[in-house]
């Protein structure tokens, strides 16, 4: 069984159908929630966590991993997974903005993000 690991703050149960189908093309989706990275951690602490999670991810032998979140952790984890030969992806969305004027005459912008594709790191 091939797997697609979703390592983000966005559970796959809340994805739109297009994103779910694109992920399932790689295999069964497994959610591995993105960790909370304290702002006071130094680079070594972040890298240790990336190494720990890379071991957990690699043990599952995924076909691909979606990684998005705190930048320094994401960079470290992406490098580790790519070095191990794993396809690491980012979700690409289109931002659709609608402007309207509310009852007070204020302009209100409403944004909606629509999944378009995965892009490899």
Predicted features and spans:
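Short glycine-rich phosphate-binding loop at a beta-alpha junction
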Residues: 63-69
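Long, low-complexity, Lys/Arg-enriched
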Residues: 1-62, 76-79, 83-121
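Conserved histidine-centered catalytic loops in small-molecule metabolism enzymes
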Residues: 72
